[in-house]
């Protein structure tokens, strides 16, 4: 990474124009094959690639030339066998160049990200805990109980190919690199139309294409979220100036810039008083939550501005039905594997004044999280642990494994789910999921030994697997040690948010 910094610092005014020459450097392909960029790749590689080929300037230029030649040849050749050979060669060329191209596209953003992380480490101790998915829920627990409305927002799709290229044009002005990116997108398999998350998700996150398309998707989402920053700043400036100034809207942005500059000198302390602290935004993958203490009319204005920004900025229909506004007091929203809501509890207080006494019901708001059983059962049924009704079935594909491996696989899934859903205020749904997995494990073992579940339990006892599935062993896939002390006892209904969970269990993710 230090070498890349020196490379870009040679001419700071033109640092974004030097990406394409890196495509002809051999060490770029070593980085691509080893999936190493000073630890900046956050997703796990599906395969352990071995770098055993040399890529020089001549070889890469020859591959790029052959890619274009094969593209022209495929339109002229009619023979089916030759067409098949042409497609196979094209895929090889694309995949080879694509691996190096993915690394190159990440370099400018990686340098910026690394510098920002170093700055935050100096300000925020233990910043690694902020990577935990569970770190979101204490924030929701603390803030949502004071808010009134919530908007469920789904990031707009489908994404046209040209939009992905246009998003990067604001960051990378290297024309040859953008042309090569456009060529990749239009030539790869079924990428000549639209990207839809249902049909193309397996291709979008396939082993070979995962790196580049995750980068493109994150860039697109970042561009979508820039609307929130723009609208938030606009709302802030409007609150910091008198309403009468903006009755006439001609040269609106010029007025904002002029007035803010003038008033900031004299009213710098007063500006902070107008900042609205009651609008919060949280996103995970393609779904986000926008919560506010304002009225329903205010939330409708935010929705209107967001839709118009997306529609004008990306030049596509922004699908208004993908933003739902609801009142927190009577609506639950599904987010990150939890069904969350704000519950109002009434506590009766006796008050006495002189000789008179009376009862008062005091309402208190509490953030409530439960495990949604229907989506989880759907995920278990899709993974062949039960049927659509939740009735446990055996797992035939695991019947050839040893007994220890079968129990270990079921136990790992159980501990993962228990660990992630430890923040649930009601555990009944989680107990049902554990029961399904426990009985599915027993049916799998009985199938392997050509026995019945009843005979299996009778021989090993009714407490078979009970102790194993309630074991509080740490999940092996986690990185950071748990912050909970071993002596801490969990009380009924107590919520625990861990700061060591960096990914959602696949069963939760698919629900």
From Swiss-Prot:
Pfam families per the UniProt record, alphabetical: Intron_maturas2, MatK_N
GO biological process: mRNA processing; RNA splicing; tRNA processing
GO (cellular component) term, any one: chloroplast
GO molecular function, one term: RNA binding
Source taxon at top rank: Eukaryota
Cell compartment(s), UniProt: Plastid, Chloroplast
InterPro entries, sorted: Domain_X (IPR024937), Maturase_MatK (IPR002866), Maturase_MatK_N (IPR024942)
Keywords: Chloroplast, mRNA processing, Plastid, RNA-binding, tRNA processing
Functional note: Usually encoded in the trnK tRNA gene intron. Probably assists in splicing its own and other chloroplast group II introns.
Family: Belongs to the intron maturase 2 family. MatK subfamily.
HAMAP family for this protein: MatK
Protein name from the UniProt record: Maturase K
Taxonomic source organism: Acorus calamus var. americanus
């Amino acid at each position: 990474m230090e070498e890349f910094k020196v490379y870009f610092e040679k001419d700071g005014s033109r640092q974004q124009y030097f990406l394409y020459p890196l495509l002809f450097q051999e060490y770029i392909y070593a980085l691509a094959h080893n999936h190493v960029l000073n630890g900046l790749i956050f997703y796990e590689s599906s395969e352990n690639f071995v770098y055993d080929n040399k890529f020089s300037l001549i070889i890469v230029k020859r591959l790029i030339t052959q890619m274009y030649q094969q593209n022209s040849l495929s339109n002229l050749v009619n023979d089916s066998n030759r067409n098949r050979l042409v497609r196979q060669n094209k895929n090889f060329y694309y995949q080879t160049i694509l691996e190096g191209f993915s690394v190159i596209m990440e370099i400018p953003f990686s340098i910026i990200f690394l510098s920002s992380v170093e700055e935050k480490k100096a300000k925020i101790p233990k910043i690694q805990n902020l990577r935990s998915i569970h770190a979101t829920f204490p924030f929701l627990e603390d803030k949502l109980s004071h808010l009134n409305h919530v908007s469920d927002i789904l990031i707009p799709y489908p994404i046209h190919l040209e939009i992905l290229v246009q998003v990067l044009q604001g960051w990378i002005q290297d024309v040859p690199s953008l042309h090569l990116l456009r060529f990749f997108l239009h030539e790869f398999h079924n990428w000549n139309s639209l990207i839809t998350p249902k049909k193309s998700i397996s291709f979008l996150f396939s082993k070979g294409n995962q790196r580049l398309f995750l980068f493109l998707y994150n860039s697109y989402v970042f561009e979508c979220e820039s609307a929130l920053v723009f609208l938030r700043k606009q709302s802030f400036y409007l609150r910091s100036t008198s309403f009468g100034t903006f009755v006439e809207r001609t040269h609106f942005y010029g007025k904002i810039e002029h007035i803010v500059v003038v008033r900031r000198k004299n009213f710098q302390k007063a500006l902070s008083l107008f900042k609205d602290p009651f609008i919060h935004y949280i996103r995970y993958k393609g779904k986000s939550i926008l919560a506010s203490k304002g009225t329903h009319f205010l939330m409708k204005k935010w929705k209107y501005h967001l839709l118009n920004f997306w529609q004008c900025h990306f030049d596509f229909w922004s699908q208004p039905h993908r933003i739902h506004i609801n009142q927190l007091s009577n609506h639950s929203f599904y987010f990150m594997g939890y069904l969350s809501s704000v519950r109002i509890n009434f506590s009766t207080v006796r008050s006495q004044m002189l000789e008179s006494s009376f009862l008062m019901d005091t309402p208190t708001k509490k953030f409530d999280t439960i495990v949604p059983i229907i989506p989880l059962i759907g995920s278990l049924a899709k993974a062949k642990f039960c049927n659509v009704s939740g009735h446990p079935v055996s797992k035939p594909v695991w019947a050839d494994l040893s007994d220890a491996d079968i129990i270990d696989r079921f136990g790992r899934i159980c501990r993962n789910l228990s660990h992630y859903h430890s923040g649930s205020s009601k555990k009944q749904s989680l107990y049902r999921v554990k029961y399904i997995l426990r009985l599915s494990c027993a049916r799998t073992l009985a199938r392997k030994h050509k026995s019945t579940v009843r005979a299996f339990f009778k021989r090993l006892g009714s407490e078979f697997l009970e102790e194993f599935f309630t074991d509080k062993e740490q999940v092996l896939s986690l990185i950071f040690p748990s912050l909970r002390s071993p002596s801490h006892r969990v009380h009924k209904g107590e919520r625990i948010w861990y700061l060591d969970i960096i990914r959602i269990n696949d069963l939760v993710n698919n629900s």
